[in-house]
C-alpha cells in the first residue's frame, strides 16, 4: 500500500538544507512512499536538483517527489495568531491543507511549534471527544533487567500549559493508542507524572485524573511516576500537562549537554597520565552516544487531530528529520486518528 506525505520544506532552522536531503533518503529507502515538498517552487526545485545529484538519486525515485508551490514562510519566532490569520499561503499552512483535502495522508514540519499547533487545529479540527490536541514525543528508556534501550511516550509537551483532569484522561487514551500501535503492545502501561507515588500527593487535577484512569478498563493504568523514573522503562506512556512536560523535556536536553561538556572538560584538563584511561574509554563513549542518538527519537506527534501532523525538532539534522518522516508513515499505517476516535467513543 502506498502513502503520501506533505513536507513543510521551508520550515525549521535549516529549511531546505534539512528537508530536501531527508525527503530524498526517505523515498529512496521506502518504495511505497511519495512526498510532496511544499514551498517556494524555484528554491525547492533548485535544492532538489542539487541534492539529488550529490546523492546520485535515480529517476524512478525522483518521480515519487512532487513540488507544491507556497509563496510564504512562517518564521520560527512568528506569532501563532499571525501565522493562522495572515499567512494563508505559507508552506506550513498549505502542507496541512493537503492533509485536510485528502491529497496526502500526513504532514511533517520542523517549523514554529506554536504556529504548527494553532494552524493544525484550525485547519484539521480535533476528533470528537478531544478538547485539545497534545504534543507527544518518544523518549529513550533503558530496561535494567533486559539491558535494552526502549521508548517511552510522553505527553503533553507544551501544547496545553494548564490541563483539566478530563484532558489528562484524554491524553492517556491517545498516548496508549499510539504506544500500542508503535510498540506492538496489547496493553501499554500508562502513568501520570507526579511529585510522588503516594495517592495523596499532587494537584487536584492530577488526583482526579488518576481516579478517572482507575475506573477505565481500556487503560492499563500504573499509577503515579516520579521524574527520576522517566528513563527506567517502567511505563510506556507518561501523561502530564504541557507546562510540566515542556520543562521536563528541556531539562533533559540540558542535562545531556552538561554531561557531554563535563566529559570534554575532564579530557582537556587532566594530566597526560590520567588521559590514557580516558582515551582508552573513548570507544565506549562513542558506543554509548550512538545508542543514545537523539536523531532516532525525533518526531513529535500532534495527537487528537482529525489528520496526522508530525513535528520535527526545529534544529534537526537531515537524519533526524528523516526519522520524523518515518514516524508519520507509522501513524498512517495504523490510522491513528481513526483509532483514537473509535476508542474514545467506547470509553466516553
Swiss-Prot record:
Keywords: Cytoplasm, Lipid biosynthesis, Lipid metabolism, Phospholipid biosynthesis, Phospholipid metabolism, Transferase. GO terms for biological process: fatty acid biosynthetic process; phospholipid biosynthetic process. One of its GO terms (molecular function) is phosphate:acyl-[acyl carrier protein] acyltransferase activity. GO terms for cellular component: cytoplasm. It holds the Pfam family FA_synthesis. Pathway: Lipid metabolism; phospholipid metabolism. Its EC number is 2.3.1.274. It catalyses: a fatty acyl-[ACP] + phosphate = an acyl phosphate + holo-[ACP]. InterPro entries: FA_synthesis (IPR003664), Phospholipid_synth_PlsX-like (IPR012281). SUPFAM superfamilies: Isocitrate/Isopropylmalate dehydrogenase-like (SSF53659). It is found in: Cytoplasm. It is an enzyme of class 2 (transferase). Belongs to the PlsX family. Catalyzes the reversible formation of acyl-phosphate (acyl-PO(4)) from acyl-[acyl-carrier-protein] (acyl-ACP). This enzyme utilizes acyl-ACP as fatty acyl donor, but not acyl-CoA. Homodimer. Probably interacts with PlsY. This is Phosphate acyltransferase.
Amino acid at each position: 500500500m502506498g502513502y503520501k506525505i506533505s513536507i513543510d520544506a521551508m520550515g525549521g532552522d535549516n529549511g531546505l538544507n534539512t528537508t530536501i536531503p531527508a525527503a530524498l533518503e526517505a523515498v529512496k529507502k521506502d518504495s511505497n512512499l511519495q512526498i510532496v515538498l511544499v514551498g517556494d517552487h524555484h528554491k525547492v526545485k533548485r535544492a532538489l536538483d542539487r541534492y539529488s545529484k550529490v546523492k546520485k538519486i535515480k529517476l524512478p525515485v525522483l518521480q515519487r517527489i512532487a513540488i507544491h508551490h507556497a509563496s510564504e514562510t512562517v518564521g520560527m519566532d512568528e506569532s501563532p495568531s499571525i501565522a493562522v490569520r495572515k499567512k494563508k499561503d505559507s508552506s506550513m499552512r498549505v502542507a496541512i491543507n493537503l492533509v485536510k483535502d485528502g491529497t496526502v495522508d500526513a504532514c511533517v514540519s520542523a517549523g514554529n511549534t506554536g504556529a504548527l499547533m494553532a494552524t493544525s487545529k484550525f485547519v484539521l479540527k480535533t476528533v470528537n471527544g478531544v478538547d485539545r490536541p497534545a504534543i507527544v514525543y518518544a523518549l529513550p528508556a533503558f530496561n535494567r533487567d533486559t539491558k535494552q534501550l526502549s521508548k517511552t511516550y510522553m505527553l503533553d509537551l507544551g501544547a496545553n500549559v494548564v490541563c483539566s483532569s478530563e484532558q489528562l484522561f484524554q491524553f492517556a487514551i491517545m498516548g496508549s493508542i499510539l504506544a500500542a500501535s508503535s510498540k506492538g503492545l496489547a496493553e501499554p502501561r500508562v502513568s501520570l507524572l507526579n511529585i510522588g507515588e503516594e495517592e495523596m500527593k499532587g494537584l487536584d487535577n492530577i488526583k482526579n485524573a488518576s481516579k478517572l484512569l482507575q475506573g477505565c478498563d481500556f487503560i492499563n493504568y500504573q499509577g503515579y511516576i516520579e521524574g527520576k523514573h522517566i528513563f527506567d522503562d517502567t511505563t510506556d506512556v507518561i501523561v502530564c500537562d504541557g507546562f510540566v512536560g515542556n520543562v521536563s523535556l528541556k531539562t533533559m536536553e540540558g542535562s545531556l549537554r552538561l554531561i557531554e561538556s563535563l566529559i570534554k572538560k575532564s579530557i582537556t584538563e587532566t594530566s597526560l597520565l590520567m588521559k590514557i584511561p580516558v582515551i582508552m574509554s573513548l570507544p565506549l563513549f562513542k558506543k554509548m552516544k550512538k545508542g543514545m542518538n537523539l536523531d532516532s527519537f525525533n518526531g513529535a506527534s500532534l495527537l487528537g487531530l482529525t489528520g496526522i501532523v508530525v513535528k520535527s525538532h526545529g534544529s534537526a539534522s537531515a537524519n533526524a528529520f528523516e526519522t520524523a518522516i518515518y514516524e508519520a508513515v507509522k501513524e498512517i499505517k495504523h490510522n491513528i486518528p481513526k483509532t483514537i476516535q473509535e476508542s474514545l467513543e467506547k470509553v466516553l
